[in-house]
Regions:
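Hydrophobic helical membrane-anchoring modules
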Residues: 1, 147, 171-262
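Short hydrophobic beta-strand elements that form part
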Residues: 6-10, 57
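Donor nucleotide-sugar binding loop of glycosyltransferases
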Residues: 14-17, 40, 93
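A conserved acidic beta->alpha catalytic loop
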Residues: 37-45
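A short, conserved beta-strand element in the Rossmann-like catalytic core
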Residues: 39, 63, 91
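Acceptor/aglycone-binding surface of glycosyltransferases and processive sugar-polymer synthases
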Residues: 58-77, 94-177, 204-223
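Short beta-strand-to-loop acidic/aromatic patch adjacent to the donor-nucleotide binding site
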Residues: 80-91
């Protein structure tokens, strides 16, 4: 039996691009689309409801990470076997959804990332030079920290197996942009298999993009995250953030049995 595929869209003022993003989704592969609105001031909610999406609304702008927390929690409640995050700003190609879920369906990966740096020249596709080179540097640093060899971690196009989202404690993560890297670090700490596919990217006026200042803060927070991860991995300072929930519950059950409380 094929897993239930649910697309989640973390949205903030996406009225101009939401419809075109949704229309390009290959519906034959998707059982449900969940949109979480993070305090938009435009017509995002109205358009989402017009498209018959399942809509959840934050009463104010809590942040990109907070939006994803609601996305994944609601997708799991809805019985998703595979959860695909698609930004509603049309920056990533929705038609590549079959490719991004296939490694999970084939049992080859628990998390698949859509890499813009594997697809050719991101600079030619419009990625700002400062964003391109900082992406390359941070990805190299993460590869060193994680012991992996991927071409990009800073993508908003990603697919998760249900079991991975149940294992990582994503509720402990930031409500901001660094959530994207925290959940990857958690996946690595849990021993998840991570794959990637090449995806093109579009940069245009309506597409959302972090400013230079936001990107600088994001980069500094990644450095702090990697320091915490390395300390956890080496055993110098264990962090609950990187512990598998499955293992924690199993350890708790064993402890209760040992003390005769079960």
């Amino acid at each position: 039996m094929k897993p239930k595929v649910i697309v989640v869209m973390p949205a903030y003022n996406a009225a101009r691009t939401l419809r075109m993003t949704y229309e390009k989704l290959p519906k034959e592969y998707v059982q449900s689309v969940i949109l979480v609105d993070d305090g938009s001031t435009d017509e995002t909610i109205a358009i989402a409801r017009e498209l018959n999406l399942e809509v959840f609304v934050h009463t104010r702008n809590y942040g990109y990470g907070a939006n994803q927390k609601t996305c994944y929690a609601e997708a799991l409640k809805a019985g998703a076997g595979i959860v695909v995050m698609v930004h509603p700003d049309y920056q990533y190609d929705p038609t590549l959804l079959p490719e991004i879920i296939q490694p999970i369906i084939d049992g080859e990966a628990d998390l698949v990332l859509g890499s813009r740096l594997r697809a050719g020249s991101a600079l030619e596709q419009g990625m700002p030079w400062w964003k391109y080179y900082s992406n390359r540097f941070l990805t190299w640093l993460e590869n060193v920290s994680f012991g992996l060899h991927h071409t990009e971690y800073h993508t908003g196009y990603r697919a998760f197996h249900r079991s991975l989202l149940e294992a990582v404690n994503f509720s402990m993560n930031s409500d901001g942009f660094v959530f994207d890297q925290e959940i990857i670090a958690q996946a690595v700490a849990c021993g998840a298999r991570i794959g990637e596919i090449a995806v093109p990217v579009r940069y245009f006026r309506e597409a959302s993009s972090a400013s230079f200042f936001q990107s600088t803060i994001y980069g500094l927070r990644i450095l702090w995250l990697l320091a915490k991860y390395v300390l956890h991995k080496t055993g110098l300072h264990k962090s609950r953030q990187f512990q598998s929930l499955h293992r924690r519950y199993a350890a708790a059950d064993e402890s209760e049995k040992a003390h005769g409380t079960v």
